[in-house]
Structure formats: structure tokens, C-alpha cells
Swiss-Prot record:
UniProt KW Cell membrane keyword: yes
Catalytic activity reported: ATP + H2O + polyamine-[polyamine-binding protein]Side 1 = ADP + phosphate + polyamineSide 2 + [polyamine-binding protein]Side 1
Lineage of producing organism: Bacteria, Bacillati, Bacillota, Bacilli, Lactobacillales
Organism: Leuconostoc mesenteroides subsp. mesenteroides (strain ATCC 8293 / DSM 20343 / BCRC 11652 / CCM 1803 / JCM 6124 / NCDO 523 / NBRC 100496 / NCIMB 8023 / NCTC 12954 / NRRL B-1118 / 37Y)
SMART domains: AAA
Main function: Part of the ABC transporter complex PotABCD involved in spermidine/putrescine import. Responsible for energy coupling to the transport system.
Name recorded for this polypeptide: Spermidine/putrescine import ATP-binding protein PotA
UniProtKB keywords: ATP-binding, Cell membrane, Membrane, Nucleotide-binding, Translocase, Transport
A Pfam family it matches: ABC_tran
Major location (coarse): membrane
Cross-referenced NCBIfam families: potA
Record: residues binding ATP: 41-48
One cellular-component annotation, GO: ATP-binding cassette (ABC) transporter complex
Amino acid sequence: MSEKQVPIIAFNQVDLSFGDTHVLNNVDLEIEAGKFYTLLGPSGSGKSTILKLISGQLTADSGDISFEGQRVNDVPAEKRKVNTVFQNYALFPNMNVFDNVAFGPTLKGMNKTEIKNKVKEMLNLVKLSDFVDREIDELSGGQQQRVAIARALANDPEVLLLDEPLSALDYKLRKSMQYELREIQQRLGITFVFVTHDQEEALAMSDWIFVMNDGVIQQNGSPEDIYDEPINHFVADFIGESNIVDGIMKEDYVVHFVGKDFENVDAGMRPNERVEVVLRPEDLDLTSIENGKLVVTIEDQSFRGDYYEITARDDDGNEWQVQATNSAIIGARVGLTFDPEDIHIMRFNESEDDFDARLESYEDDDEI
């Protein structure tokens, strides 16, 4: 982040407990203006709690929450420049589409012409301009979600918070809404903070992702960085599918696993350090035993539409997931091949700061 740019939202050592349950553990985060952020994690990871702290629905036990450099811990929710879209939409069933979207501008004291123009602008934005007089119970789930977004944006928030807003929609509609939300955010240029447990949603929409588990931000970064360079077992397993096996980092760019040494592109670790090795299923190719870097036995497969999901096992008992364009024969022994850059190495208990510093150090060495 540029030194001159003050984050629109920042958490500094934020801690929160509910009774004996520690919900957030000394969370630090920074959110820049005008980007799409996602808080990603399983149920109970603390992601929705962060959203409620931003909106003012909850108060932290300790630590500072700031908005554009100003501490807001004690600022009430109604005075914060944020609006929230909820999973259940929270629309007013006794009001039609126009009145739902006009609710916020009316409370702000806009005149009738301003309200009409604002509602028209918001409904155009969410592609519901022809639904202005519809009753809420006449709308589909996707249409109700669009109305909820329009209503939240009609208040001109600097930050829009979205708490799992797509989880109740069917798969095709959810995919469509992913693109629409991203388009809306880019058109408006305001900050979106999106909460989800769905890693596909996070990867598809986000500029930046915070991966959470047990009240701790495990890793934050761009979708590409988090997918390609997971920091630990949890992130590697939660973001996409992963094959994870134990290994030993013999020296820079050489790792030992399943009884063999393999070239890779990682460095900056101690000689003979115990590590975990990650290979993504889509990076593995089936080949002949003679050409394979590993030899496995095919145990199972399922057709996934554009690929076969194949389960195999090596002679050491490690299970391997492979995505292949062609089917395999159950019980057959085959080879697996992959490239050095497909191997990702994870250290045990490496902090995110140390992880980033290590990557930067050996990437700089490669450029010399």
C-alpha cells in the first residue's frame, strides 16, 4: 500500500469475545478505497463479525477501528458511511420496489424529485428499471437481491458491506450475480466488503481476499497470490483442491517427497527443513509409468462435465487427486508428471510477514 494513502478502513489489534468464546484474535487489516474485498472462511471463522464491527453493530473488546484515519470504535452505526446487504435481503414486504429503494433518501430529507431520480438511477444500475411499481412478493430471489443492493446504494455509502448475499440463490443465478456485483462496484468506484464461505465467489470477484479461520486472518492477498502461494495447510486446503504431502527441503530449489528429490522454484528455508508440499490436481498429468515422476494406482473417478476427477494412490499410501480430460481405468498403474513451478512449498508455523519477506528475498535473488 502506498505510504501516502490512508486506508478507508483499518483494524489494529482488534480483539472480541462472546463470553468464553474468543471470536477475533488481535486482527490487523487495511482496506483501500475503491476496491472489492472479500472476507473468506468457514462458518464461525469471524468474517461476519468483522463486518458487524465495521458497520457498528458490534463493539470491539480492545484494539482500534478507524475510518479514513479517524478512530470510530465509539461512533454509532447510523453515523458511519456504510450500508449492509444481508443474506435474507431484509426488504420491507409492505412497500413496493420504489418505496424500498426510496426509503434511505427519504430519511435523509431529499425532495421528491431528487428521490425519484435517485431511485431511477439505482434501478437502472441493477437492471430493474421496469420493476419500479412491483410488489416485493412478485419478485424472484435474484430480483429481490438486486432491490436490496439498490436500496443500500441509494444512501451513497462510501463502503458497501455484503454479508453472504448470494448464498440463497441457485447456482446459475449466483454465477450471474457475481459478475453483476463486480460490474456495479467497478462502475461506482466505491469500496465493497463481501463475506462468503465460497472460495469460487471470492476468487471470481475480488481484488483482495482475507482468508479467515478461528478468528485469525490466515493470509491476505490477491486471488492469484493466495491460490498459487498458500501460506499454510488450511489455506491450501480451503482455497480450491490440493494434494498435500510431507516433504524435506534439501536445499534451495530441491525438495524431497515420496522418496525422491524434485526441482522446484521455492527457496529461503533451512537445509533439510521439514515442510509440506502442495500440488494442485489441475497441475498433474497422467502419463506412462516410464515417463512419470510418480507412479500411482487409479482408485476412482467421476465425470465433472469438462474434466474427470480421478483419485489415485502411490505406493507410500498418499492419495492424489487429478483433473484429467480423458477417463482412466480403475486399478491401472500409471505415471504422474508435473513441472517444477507446479510444486509449492509450505513451512510449518510461518507467519505471513516472514512468508512475504522470504518470497521477496529469493525473488530478488533470481533477478540479480
